Each structure stands twice: as C-alpha cells, then as structure tokens.
C-alpha cells in the first residue's frame, strides 16, 4: 500500500481556513438550500458546497460516510446530516434492506420539516425508480422547489441497458424539476429533445475542476518511486471506476502497438475499483494482461483509492488516457487537470471542447487502438511531455481559468434566486 503523504492534514486545514475567510467576507443572507448528494461523488458535493457557501448560501448537506469530511462539521453556514452511515458494512439482505428503508424514512421526514424551500439533487439514491417518481411527487406535494444536476441525461442508454420504464421515470423526474443543470450544450439538446424539457429550465455549467483532494509538496519523481517506477519510465495511467463503456480493452491493444524498441520504457497503470455488475469485464481485462504482457508492464491496482493516494498516481503518471467508447463528460479529466496532468482521450462527448490539443492533451478516434497508440506516441514526442515539469502548471492554470467552482456557484445561485422569486410570486 502506498504510504500516506505527510502534509494531508495541513492541506485540508488550509482549505478549511480559506473557506471560512470567504464566508466571513460575504455577509449575504437569505437563501437556504438542501443539497441531496445521493451519498456519492464527494469531490463534486464538496466543491459545490464550499463555492455556494462562499456566496452566502446556507446549506444542509444530506449524505453518508462516503461524503463526510472534517470541513463539513466545521464550516459556518453548513449543516451535514449523515442519514446513510457506512454503506460498505457487510450484512445480510434483511439488514441492508432495513438500513435503506431507514435512510428513506429520514429523507422523507427531513423534506417535510426542513427550512430550505429548494432541494438540489446532485445524484439519485439507490432505488432510482422510486427517486424519480414517488419521491419527486412527494417533494412537489409538500411545496418544495427542485433543482437537479443531470450528470448523465440517460445513463442506461450509454450502458446499453435502456428500457421503457427507465425512459418514463426519467421523463417524470425531468418534468417535475423546476431547474436542471447539465455540463454541455449537447446534454441540454438531448434533454430538451428526448424528454420535452423547456430550454429556459436548463442551465449549462461547464464541469468544474476537481480540487477536493490533497495536493502536497510531493514531487513527480517521489510519486513515481512510490508507485514502484523509475524516473525515466513513461507512465501511462487509466484512472477511475472500471466499467465496459470506458474501453480499457482498446487501451491494452494500443499499448501493445507502441514501438517495440520503446516498450521497455513504457508502463501502463490501471487504477480504480470496478462498478458493481462489471465483474465479467474486469475478468477479461485481467486475462488479457496475464496473457499478452510481460510481468510488470501493466500494473493493475483494482481497489478503492483513499484520498491521500490520488496525488501519488496523478503526479507519478506522465499522461492520463481516457479510451472511452461513449460519454458526455468525465470528472476524471478535471481531476487530472487539477494536478496538471495532460490527457489523451477519444473524441467522444465533450472531450473535444475540454482538451486543447498540444496544450492540455491530444484526441484520437474511439474504438481504434491504432489511432490511440498514435496519439500516445505523438504526446510522448511533443513539447508538452518533454517540458512536462513546466507545462503541468500551465494545465492547472487553464483548468482553473475555464472550469472554476466560482463560475459554477454564480450560475447555480442565479437559478436558485429565480426559483425562489417564482415561489414568492
């Protein structure tokens, strides 16, 4: 296991102090919001919460242990309600059922009694069909305004699992929302065309940079050492949940196509835990690695990665590769940018809008290992890689200039005020 970096506590404390300074300097009052996290995606929930609080919004954050952090208990104007607890505890089916039932009961009671007139859903909960229909109808019946961040307009279609019931319940949820946030114009277009959502009820907010993880004084050289790599080895990283639509098999094929005389210098790291239901896909990946590569060429770290280990991978790698078959946008891209790591990605979704070729990364065709291998070669022969120690800061600067949480908070705050104005009238 990778050793924890020594400055994690100091980094977290510094972020907390900065947030408190912003809160004190902004005395604006009057807006109270209930942020429903679905007990997942802590970086997004944390980033949005801190940005909204800096604008003077009072927040209730509803979640579980996976969302929890010290700042959620010490930041002014923020109340963290841990309704879900530890979702990873082992137990029989009956115990899991009762825990889930208890969570929904707490959520229903909260909605009935809470001060916030606006509930902002970041993610649905475990029983999505229930969340999209009955829970939405309940929120509206008790007079709540509903905002929703649709990170994926129709995830089931992307995963080839679409159904009539999925589309109907999605339409119910989208139609009952007072406002919806999406990350790209293409997502807005699909939302309006496929689910008859009115355009003025949708705001496009560019996916913000993911800066919720510690970024210490750890150097790339030290990070490589912790990963078991030599400083002159070229480290290619795939990072994130292991799922079929992410195209890891194409990355393995592309890795085999890299120049034979350079093979000894390349290392591929696949790091992340599998999404439930992706066990067969993971088995195929493991078999391919064992069959087609020499020992040590491909490093599989198939496990949950603690926050303090994120920077080890993102500083130790020389490039992040996203060989996705299909996607609208990816938070992993912006996590890489927050550490100044360039990205090679397939030309799907919004990647063409988010990757500046030659400056923050390169694009290739989806489902084409040869083109992916070519893009990786182009990257390692480019000035972007040859001057990576300097160019990392430029990638960071680009990300914070174009994908700031401040901009997200501005647009989100405006939507909240309009919703409340309509409620008052």
What is the predicted role of each segment?
Residues 26-30, 38-46, 50-103, 108-111, ...:
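N-terminal strand-loop element at the rim of the active site
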Residues 389-418:
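A charged, aromatic-enriched C-terminal amphipathic alpha-helix characteristic of glycosyltransferases
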Residues 282-311:
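Nucleotide-activated donor-binding/catalytic signature segment of Leloir-type glycosyltransferases, i.e.
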Residues 357-358, 362-369, 378-384:
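Conserved acidic donor-binding segment of nucleotide-sugar-dependent glycosyltransferases
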Residues 312-328, 341:
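Acidic donor-binding loop of glycosyltransferase active sites
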Residues 230-246, 252-255, 268-269:
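Conserved donor-binding/catalytic core segment of Leloir-type glycosyltransferases
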Residues 186, 208:
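Carbohydrate-associated surface elements
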Residues 342-345, 355:
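Short hydrophobic beta-strand element within catalytic cores of glycosyltransferases
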